[in-house]
Amino acid sequence: MFTVLDVSRWQGRIDWDTVKASGRVHGVMLRALGSRSGTPYIDPMFETNYSACIRLGIPVGVYYYSCAVTAPQRDAELALLHDALRGKRLQLPAAIDVEDARLRALTPDALSALVAGAARQLEHWGLYAMVYTYTHFADTALHMDTLAPFDLWLADYRGKRPARRHGMWQYTSRGRVPGISGPVNLSRTEKDYPALLHRAGLDRTIL
């Protein structure tokens, strides 16, 4: 079992040397994009966190917070994400964070088709695409059969491993890791994503 944490600007400045030395973390999902009133922006701590993790040999993946309800909005998010990722290498998946209440303006079929299109674009870039959401959103706002080709990163804090098929389970938002002030999200996965991506040739530099 592997432990993965995810961080964004809200964790502030992280002492990554201490995180690494703790031996508690096997990988990190960094927020690449946030959203401000529906407008995407590159997380201001992304570059700093990425550079530190690479320096220390901590496997890195990314996620971006999506508010897109149209194809042009989705494509604008992807264009900015590509700018953020160009020249970098990932050892963990690239995840689309699908949880914003504004996304409920779409039917489950329409939203799932939009998200699947984004995931296919990530794959076109040579990334391992993943979809992040929480259990109630998956049950009520998405058509999960449409998203079945992509690993699911599922948030569920009820203490029991979710029955829904998933690649990674975010089990708490109140984790504690040395080197990080305050609580942090923690996930578990049985998949050795760095080895999986390496075998598939998906850990190459993003062009």
What are these model-derived regions, one by one?
Residues 60, 128-129, 152:
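Hydrophobic anchor at the start of a short beta-strand
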Residues 64, 133, 156:
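Short beta-strand/turn micro-motifs composed of small residues
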Residues 37, 69, 138, 161, ...:
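Flexible, glycine-rich phosphate/dinucleotide-binding loops
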Residues 35, 101, 136-137, 159-160, ...:
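Short, solvent-exposed loop/turn segments at secondary-structure junctions
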Residues 1-18, 22, 26, 143-207:
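Functionally critical loop-and-helix segments that line ligand-binding/catalytic clefts
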Residues 1-26, 30-119, 123-125:
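Substrate-binding cleft of extracellular glycoside hydrolase catalytic domains
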